[in-house]
Amino acid sequence: MPHISVPAAELNTRLDRLRCAMTEKDPAWSMLLLDNTLDMYYFTGTMQDGALVVTPDQATLFVRRSFDVAKDESAFADIRPMGSFRGIKEVYPDIPETVYVAAKTMTLQKLSMLNKHLPFAPKPMDGVLSALRSVKSAYELDCMRESGRLHRYVIEGLAPAFLREGVSEARLCSEICTAIVDRGGMGISRYNQPAAEDVLGIASFSENSLCPTALDSPSGCIGTSTAMKSIGSSERKLHEGDTVLLDIPCGLRGYHTDKSITFYYGELDKHPQSGVIRAAREQCIALENETASLLRAGSVPAEIYEKILSLVDPAFREGFMNGCKFLGHSIGLTMDETPVLAKGFSAPLESGMTLAVEPKIAIPGVGLIGCENTYEITADGPAQSLTGACDTLFEVLNQ
């Protein structure tokens, strides 16, 4: 069965928005060139080895591999095979002195290969790309809503039954990810951060959930090894009295949703710090609900962040967000897009933006407690959760 393609009308609209944004940035712009597969997917609906060239009145996708696949799955108007970057100059003989590129993803090696045939000076356009992707179209929102429904079903509905005495972190994460993929999920989580890798997600028990990783995230994990700080440990087994952190994304047709959930495996009242654990959980639920009420078109992310920080109980301030300086983040084709609910983000939120909100509290000697859901900013009224509730089942009894 063929995969669902990005509609031609959607691609045309994105290209129009790109040209308008570039003209607003630089009225004299004459060419941009994108080689990153994610940018390529956004504007052409296919991910290939090649380059997308856009001018004010022309756009061509040059494909090294695989041209046949690109033609089969993309509705982009002009797709051409390319043996080398020399082929670009055959179509665009007048290469300008300055060409806009995605500086964050274009390597020096790729730039050198391009300059061998196309002598230009690169100029960054990353801010334009981020701004375009931050506001989702109706098509993109449909993808994310569908991902959110699947996400909620697996994490809230199926995951509790996967908890059992002796299951490892790695096995638990793998089983949950398999449940997502079996139901149409992508099986990958893409990031902008250089320190992040395209991985399944994490499952962490008790103290392991406090172990920081290179990824700018409150969720901790000791990983499968020192070389992979993700998924979870195959050695750490689940036992009664453990807290369980699941931070496992979901995605459909390129678009992600983010959701975290914490469980207590056993009877919470038997834990010596049951009161602290319960209070931390209630605090995180209240903070997520309050944040969601503030996520409105026109609201300023930095102001929301400061407001929520002021509501954190003094007893939990030291462990709030496990050392991270944000409360939530935009999400879409990657897990970590902009804007971010943090200091310095002063541009108002817009209808069609999607953000994950993830209040979490680190409790020494216990683990990370918290919640997370992905929200859609609407034209009027508070944001709507795409991934379900934050006040979910907490205690899972050992069967």
Please state what every model-predicted region is.
Residues 1-399:
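Active-site neighborhoods and metal-handling regions in enzymes and metal-associated proteins
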